[in-house]
């Protein structure tokens, strides 16, 4: 099990705590330090069951607006996340072939 984690983020910490309380020790991926590449992002989309990259993006992030991404296509958005990982919504928990966004944190329980 993996968690794409940002330690300062309260939702990310709460999600990690939910896993730990269930005796799950996930591989913690600090995605700002080790950004996912485009293939990893595409794999995340499949596991999340989404077709639009925006569904896993922080669209309210100032950088999103600065880069003018509001009308960008999926490929452009994937490249933007790979280059600027702070645009990736967090946390994301991956278990086998499924993933869930921890917003709210309890949502990840569905794939445990």
Summary of predicted features, one role per range:
Residues 31-112:
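Thiol/selenol-based redox catalytic cores and closely related redox-interacting motifs
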Residues 25-26, 61:
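Short, solvent-exposed secondary-structure junction/capping segments
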Residues 1-18, 26-31:
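Local sequence-structure signature of Cys/Sec-based thiol-disulfide redox active-site neighborhoods
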């Amino acid at each position: 099990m993996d968690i794409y984690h940002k330690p300062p983020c309260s939702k990310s910490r709460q999600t990690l705590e939910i896993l730990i309380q269930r005796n799950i020790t996930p591989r913690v991926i600090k995605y700002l330090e080790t950004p996912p590449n485009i293939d990893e992002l595409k794999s995340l989309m499949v596991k999340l069951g989404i077709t639009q990259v925006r569904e896993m993006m922080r669209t309210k992030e100032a950088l999103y607006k600065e880069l003018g991404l509001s009308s960008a296509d999926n490929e452009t958005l994937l490249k933007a996340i790979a280059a600027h990982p702070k645009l990736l919504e967090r946390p994301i928990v991956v278990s086998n072939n499924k993933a869930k966004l921890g917003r709210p944190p309890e949502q990840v329980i569905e794939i445990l």
